[in-house]
Amino acid sequence: MKQTKTLKVRVKDKHAAQLNRMARSVNFVWNYLNELSARAIRERGLFLSTYDMHPYTKGAGKDLGLHSQTLQEIAREYATRRKQFKKTRLAWRKSGGVRRSLGWIPVNTGAAKWKNGQVFHNGCYFKVWDSYGLSQYKFRSGSFSEDARGRWYFNVVVEVDIQPNQAQGEVGIDLGLTDTA
């Protein structure tokens, strides 16, 4: 029987500068989609779906240093959160300052792979502290995320085989009858 599980592994600190650049680009795309969506609602009274946003971001990945599937994931996440919170406009993702947003880089299924003992995404290799043996898993969707101390993590959904519990042990029930006997 298979079950999905999310694994979180720490990315080595030497990749922080590159991941920060990518996170700034993600924030830029998020803010662009925020403005685009708010303008479409204001001018046409139309909520843009995930697929309506794709033509507006097509080709921007090369200039921003992001994978094309990352742009699609940002649009999907934006549309999901806008619908979840029932807002016409969501908060800006800030890249600098005291109240900046923590780094987040979404990864679509198939955009990240395990190669040569490292995570391969967007033409770059990222070394990680592999405590799970990631080579034995097939990656599904995931993300790179930053914590408050500036450390980066790679979060990925994988399928794992689980063994059903046979439950062959014995269970004893105390009925409390010794007090009444």
Place the predicted regions along the sequence by residue:
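Nucleic-acid substrate recognition interfaces
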Residues: 1-181
